[in-house]
Amino acid sequence: MTSPITEPVPAGRIAFIGGGNMARSLIGGLIGRGTAPGDIRVVAPSLSTREALQRDFGVATFESAAEAVRGADVWMFAVKPQVMPGVCAELAEAARAARPLAVSVAAGITTAQMERWLGGDVAVVRAMPNTPSMLGAGVTGLYANARVDEAGRQRADAVLATAGATVWIEDESLMDSVTAASGSAPAYVFLLAEAMEDAAIAQGLPADAARTLVLQTILGAARMLTESGESPAELRRRVTSPGGTTHAAITTFEKGGLRELVARAMGRAADRGRELSAANDDTADSGDPS
């Protein structure tokens, strides 16, 4: 795993296909670490999106993907999975000529699918960021196909590290587990916070007090996990005194099957990722990117 980088990202022109929240986060991170706005090109179908990107970052924006990728050696695909086959088909001829490094942050899209849709013989990195990446506090799982050389891996890592930590996976089949462990996982924490708030309010605490208590506890616990160097199990043991209040709560969680429920939920998330990948193939084969 790497920590978020502070040094400049290697030079070169980067084209973003898609100008949504994730693209904005990465663009802001790149510029903050020394990438010239003139080296970033963005295609977005919406005029208001293009105008906002120009205003906020000073980057060049385009309505045409073919124009946006011209002269770029890194293509960042940040569009919805269901439109990816059509977007790639539009760029296949340019990809065959330019041989770019293609980086996809679309969920459920495999490197084989990207390479095939772009016409073959393309270096592809598959990235799975999570939503805290939009705050520069996320983590991204990365997988590179065999056509990506070490320089390409470093370049992809440098771009995604502007949004948080990075973890490289050497077996692409495990990217669905990355989705389960981090891509979807912020929602698990949100659900826990929601349940804790509801329980605190049910016990009589005012809603604003319940929210502050729960959110600051989650934030503090996360800092302890990242800064202490101790395992989650060890930290839990340290605050769980036999016969105490924490012990009563933890025992209730364990008897209620919390571990098994988490394992089932994460397993279902990974399974759903595989199902979506297969559906992407079906969509592309039908010729209907919608």
Question: Predicted segments — roles?
Answer:
Residues 1-71, 201-203:
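NAD(P)+-binding Rossmann beta1-loop-alpha1 motif at the extreme N-terminus of oxidoreductases
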Residues 2, 8, 215-290:
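NAD(P)-dependent Rossmann-like dehydrogenase/reductase catalytic/cofactor-binding core
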Residues 14, 125, 174-180, 232-237:
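Short pre-catalytic strand/loop immediately N-terminal to key active-site residues, enriched for Gly-Thr
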Residues 26-27, 47, 57, 65-142, ...:
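Rossmann-like NAD(P)(H) cofactor-binding subdomain of soluble oxidoreductases
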Residues 40, 50, 68, 114, ...:
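Small-residue helix-packing motif on alpha-helices
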Residues 113-123, 139-177, 188-227, 272:
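Internal alpha-helical scaffold of NAD(P)-dependent oxidoreductase catalytic cores
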Residues 181, 193, 279-282:
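Catalytic, metal-anchored helix/loop core of enzyme active sites in primary metabolism
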